[in-house]
């Protein structure tokens, strides 16, 4: 008996990333319907979808209600917050396939402390010196150990705005302590880690829980305003060369990035007993 294919797709989220996903789905020659559960009205998405509804994308019950109403067979979750809230878990439980990891596996993206601890636990060669804090105890001694080469990162999701780098955002240990104290005041866990010097790039991989297919290497530009003079954002734009690499990378660099993503996916599978399904985001220097 041939399995009936359900080509009713749900895209969760309504930013530029989700617009690109909707456009890719829309270009498919297959007969399909595209639905979007959005946080705001995006006219580009509205032009491509059969329905766009504003709702609480972090609430599993709301998402499932929309899925059941429209007979969705596969959901693609763009933002990280719904993943952190367990929306993917809830969708799988209702029989809907999901591009996006379950809550435990998503910690590789939603918790910087978890990511560092995982790399350290599995001896993956991509981990600078770091410590995790939930109070000010030990903050100053560790800053003094690192000297002027440190980065302070809010542990959770902050839309690309939770990272403060010595020299760029923090001009002294006193300023670093003030930022750390602000995180403690909002009950936030944070990490302080060694500042790495070099060109940053990202390499993402599609994962079906069994293997990975790698995307081109890209360089992400996060700072707002002309001349990169503004604060960090979730991303102002990216670029990649025609050969799917970048001018400052060679084949060995790309292979190392591939291997780190593969090792990370394998570590997650070993730790939680199931594979990571979704887009694995690797950030490198």
Regions found by a protein language model. Give the residues of each.
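Short acidic-hydrophobic, aromatic-tinged amphipathic segments that line or gate anion-handling sites
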Residues: 51-59, 130-135, 166-171
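CheY-like receiver
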Residues: 66, 142, 179-182
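Internal nucleotide-binding/catalytic subdomain
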Residues: 147, 164-285
């Amino acid at each position: 008996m041939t399995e009936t294919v359900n080509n009713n797709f749900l895209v969760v989220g309504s930013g530029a990333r989700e617009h690109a996903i909707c456009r890719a789905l829309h270009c498919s020659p297959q007969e399909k319907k595209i639905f979007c559960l959005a946080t705001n009205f995006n006219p580009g998405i509205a032009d491509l979808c059969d329905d766009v509804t504003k709702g609480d994308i972090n609430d599993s019950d709301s998402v499932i209600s929309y899925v059941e109403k429209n007979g969705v067979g596969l959901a693609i979750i763009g933002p990280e917050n719904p993943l952190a809230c367990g929306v993917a878990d809830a969708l799988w439980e209702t029989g809907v396939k999901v591009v996006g990891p379950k809550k435990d596996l998503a910690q590789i993206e939603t918790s910087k402390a978890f990511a560092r601890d995982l790399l350290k636990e599995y001896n993956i060669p991509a981990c600078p010196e770091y410590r995790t804090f939930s109070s000010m105890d030990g903050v100053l001694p560790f800053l003094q150990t690192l000297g002027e080469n440190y980065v302070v990162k809010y542990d959770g999701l902050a839309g690309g705005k939770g990272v403060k780098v010595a020299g760029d955002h923090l001009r002294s240990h006193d300023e670093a302590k003030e930022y750390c104290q602000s995180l403690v005041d909002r009950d936030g866990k944070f990490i302080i880690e060694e500042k790495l010097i070099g060109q940053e790039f990202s390499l993402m991989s599609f994962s079906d829980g069994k293997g990975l297919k790698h995307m081109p290497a890209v360089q992400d530009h996060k700072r707002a305003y002309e001349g990169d003079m503004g604060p960090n954002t979730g991303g102002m734009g990216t670029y990649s060369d025609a050969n799917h690499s970048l001018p400052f990378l060679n084949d060995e660099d790309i292979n190392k990035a591939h291997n780190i993503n593969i090792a990370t996916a394998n570590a997650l599978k070993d730790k939680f007993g199931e594979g990571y399904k979704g887009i694995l985001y690797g950030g490198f220097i």
